[in-house]
Amino acid sequence: MRIAILADIHGNQVALEAVLEDLAQQAGIEHIVVAGDLCLNGPCPKEVLDTLRTLPCSVIQGNVDNDVFNETKKGPKKQGIVTWTREQIGAEGIDYLAALPFSKRIENPDGTDLLVVHANPLDQEEALVPSLQDNKLEQLLGKLPATTGALAFGHYHVAYTRRWRGLLLVDAGSCGMPRDEDIRASYAILTWRDDAWQAEHRRVKYDLKAVVKQLKNCGMPNADKRIKILTEAKY
């Protein structure tokens, strides 16, 4: 069993297309799960949603997807981006985001399951950062069923793998807005092999200059901040 995990596309259609092209070359992929944060903060929110709707994949909801369909009140800069994004995706796109589930469980007939969430199994906001201490992990993960052998997620935009009490934790990184000092698009492949889940992190080059040009020309408010994040790939 091989499952691809994409997360945090953030309206970056160029990066998404590059990842899908790389993914098409990987053998034995049985399913794709997109772990939320689909369209806010990037130049092509509608194009990203249109692409995802054509794919044979599962898509779950992220925190900024919630912001878009709920029109959650934020500071004036973020509110401007939310309003612009809603205008781009229209009522159909807003309804699509609202209908997305919180999580996706991949049942494994040969062993433990894979659970995919956006940030953590309890909410869409608190990040599972690599340095999280045991007591906090217990709070966020301690009630997962024993049948869960791997947890895949995004939200933090930093790709990493660690184990906690036998549970494989995999942050797929960000497809469209990495922040781990690597400007390449990120995704992960989880494989059930030798009675255990294993993770492979993949990085894919894409035309960053084209995305910067799109951001400058698309009319999205506060685009300069997004350009800085894309070109520096860090917090």
Range-by-range predicted roles:
Residues 1-4, 105-115, 164-168, 197-198:
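Beta-strand-turn-beta hairpins that frame and shape the catalytic cleft
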Residues 163-235:
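Acidic, His/Gly-rich catalytic cores of divalent-metal-dependent hydrolytic chemistry
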Residues 2-98:
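Core catalytic region of metal-dependent phosphoesterases/phosphodiesterases
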Residues 31, 127-131, 138, 166-168, ...:
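Metallo-beta-lactamase
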Residues 10-15, 40-43, 64-70, 124, ...:
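Active-site environment of divalent metal-dependent phosphoester hydrolases
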Residues 57, 147-150, 197-199:
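Short active-site oxyanion
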Residues 26-28, 89-161:
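His/acidic metal-ligating clusters that form di-metal
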